[in-house]
């Protein structure tokens, strides 16, 4: 093994911090980061990626939540696509994470609370052998509303890798 190996303990917070050698920016990946404050019900996402960009006083946070299920019945009239993808209920959970996790703003405005999560993504078990998932509504929605799903299985990490590289490079 020539890479870094990280052991995670279920139910325990684990955090890895990196400094981008090209930019000096701090990248933090937290597993089980604990309850995230909201004004209603606290939320507990699985993984939170935080990017602290140079020249910005706002940390950019993204939820990556592993779900071990897939919508295999895209013929359901309520499913928004004809190909397999993440469950609609899991996409709704990503909306909840992104929209409900907030912090109290110290900037005087009519809105006292601001969102802390810039995006939220379901990691779901799909091997996408033909590469067609790029045409799926829940992949395209990442670009438009910063919520969606990414296939994640051993050997099927290319879309996630490309997306992470884009986040870090921005």
Predicted features, each with a name:
Residues 1-170:
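Catalytic core segments in nucleotide and nucleic-acid processing enzymes
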């Amino acid at each position: 093994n020539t890479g870094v190996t990280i052991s995670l303990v279920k139910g325990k917070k684990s955090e890895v911090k990196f400094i981008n050698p090209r930019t000096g920016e701090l990248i933090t990946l937290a597993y089980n980061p604990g309850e995230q404050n909201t004004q209603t019900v606290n939320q507990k996402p699985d993984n939170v990626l935080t990017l602290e960009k140079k020249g910005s006083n706002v940390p950019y946070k993204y939820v990556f939540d592993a779900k071990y299920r897939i919508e295999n019945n895209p013929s359901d009239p309520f499913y928004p696509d004809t190909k397999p993808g993440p469950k609609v209920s899991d996409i709704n959970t990503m909306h909840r994470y992104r929209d409900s996790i907030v912090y109290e703003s110290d900037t005087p405005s009519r809105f006292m609370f601001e969102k802390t999560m810039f995006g939220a993504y379901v990691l779901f078990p799909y091997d996408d052998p033909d590469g067609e998932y790029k045409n799926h509504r829940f992949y395209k929605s990442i670009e438009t509303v910063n919520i969606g799903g990414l296939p994640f299985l051993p050997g099927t990490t290319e879309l996630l890798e490309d997306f992470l590289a884009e986040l870090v490079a921005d």
